[in-house]
């Protein structure tokens, strides 16, 4: 006997001014299509009077398409002044990973993607160096070398944006990509580009952060994953974590501990974004874990 295909799953996220009737309107539309809610999370920001919701649901096969659902939901969105996203949960986000010379975050992302822990579709790796090409090749992933110098920076960013368009990229991940992107590129990819910062923001920005941390005698080493904006390392924070250290750790040991934290923090941020669990709330985020 042939096992019937499972019903398609969708994820709906909404953000809007808070008022009565929002949940009723959303669930009412799903009921008209025999939708079954599999997971529902909501948050009411009382300080900003903003309402946030994430719903994962299924509908019977052949009953509706994601495009027609979006069209129907636009009526509700207009009524409640909502911003919303609706995705087929079985279609992974097309993802482009940017890296420079340090490959620990790239290695972690590719390993998790390869074993199915990250629901993304890695479409390629971009780098201003060749160091990580063998790693990408070991996973059968295209490696795009875009050298960056003061003279070629504009061309390199134009090449990056061309790849984003031609590969139909939804998510760009800066996995220790050590180039400052222009304001125009940051704005073009706003809300879909994640960076890992090698410190617990806002501390120790710039070069040699672990040497800065050592000189200050820190007791915690951390990392921050955030959306990229035109304000350097000031974008909305998705995830942070720390590990305890002490006077016995030299700068190299701090850096080794930091690499572990960076990899874990970035992978969590990418997973939550790929599962539509992160909603922007002004300069902050709401993360439905």
Task: Label each PLM-derived region with a short phrase.
Residues 1-93:
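A conserved regulatory-domain signal marking ACT and ACT-like small-molecule sensing domains
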Residues 15, 96-98, 126:
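Short hydrophobic segments within beta-strands
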Residues 129, 152, 156, 169-289:
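Donor/substrate-binding cores of folate-linked one-carbon enzymes
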Residues 137, 141-167:
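Adenosine-nucleotide cofactor-binding segment
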